[in-house]
């Protein structure tokens, strides 16, 4: 080894080793001071990512357990109110049994009826005022989703029901046949014109003549035809057809499960408005002519373009759609397709329904619409109005046709005229200045009177038993969901514990190991400093050569 002064390689090597040991010592001290093995991604990149995901799960599951406990509280609050309602019903039943014996005087029956009315009023008060965190739990039908997991869709639903004297079938409950009973606000389903028709089909005449900017659809009223089935339609965005500009009559055929329609005006724009939902500028469709399919786009004006490249489509002399305009053909439109005759007769299928011409000129002739498109149809016995600026004329297929009109969220039956309000109630214009609210009496008939003359309830004990049965069924469902939520909380806590242990094994520092590493690093550091001092003295040995 050469004897040099300028470069002390031994000192450099020693310094490098001291620096490495210093880094290890710093890491050990950092881990011991924080309690974490992973203080940054450089300590363990993969471990840091895994531990971070565990953190998300643990925090989410911890909150989910709190949510589930809140859900249990909701169910307990609701069941507590139902328990009190049940107590009132049991007392009413006891009083009814007492009133049913012939030994009571009129005064006795009056006293019994007074307490029954007081108990029913208390049931209504409990229904209207029982809340959990500001939510009325017995005031209306609905559901409450409880998030019981750390990810989307991990919920448990609590079904809530409206429970009051009316929903229990006890509105106007009477044992003495005296006084008056309060009538309940009528809704659309109480209108006779919206009950299921006896005939297998019906005809619906639709006339649209209100605000042009309103989003409305003839399909809303088609869904009310007898034989339709499905869920309630609340907005026209749920349906696939727009509104034809001219009046069209639709007839439902139960055997073929389809609607047929007749119209005197079938211009491209009108047909496009019918096939094209008003929320969109264009509609994708498949046009079938002579067994050949062509995917197209249909704009608001009814013009057809190819779906694949947007090229303009033309209808040639044989009735086929083509991108080639060599023969001087004009652009294909919905009107041309719809009015094609004979072998050129076309079928236009959108994602919401199918239009089929019958092979004759479409000048008042029939067309058919696939009934399967109306998956959101409304059952007649549960029909509710879609509030919006629109007017409909409905004729069912029954022998004695019932006709109703709806405009701007208003339902009318002439005579008299009824209005369906946004909250589902009905008013009438018998009092043209203000409009009277329409009620349903205890006999089920519509009236503008707020009260009805009281009559003794027929089969009162059976009515009470049915009401108590409703309470029992509701309480059973709440008990079941409480048990389910309690089980969910237990599982969430177990999962959180296991995940926390797994995260700890990855992320937390092992103090025995780290203390050992720190002690080792400190000893090496001391030794390194001592050796460095000796290494720095090596160049001085060269001086002995100069002094010799």
Swiss-Prot record:
Localization: Secreted; Bacterial flagellum
Location, primary (coarse class): secreted
Any one of the GO CC terms: extracellular region
Keywords: Bacterial flagellum, Secreted
InterPro entries in the record: Flagellin, Flagellin_C, Flagellin_C_sub2, Flagellin_N, FliC_H7
Superkingdom of origin: Bacteria
Secreted recorded as keyword: yes
Single GO molecular function: structural molecule activity
Pfam family, one: Flagellin_C
Family stated for the protein in its record: Belongs to the bacterial flagellin family.
Function: Flagellin is the subunit protein which polymerizes to form the filaments of bacterial flagella.
Protein name: Flagellin
Organism: Escherichia coli O127:H6 (strain E2348/69 / EPEC)
Gene: fliC
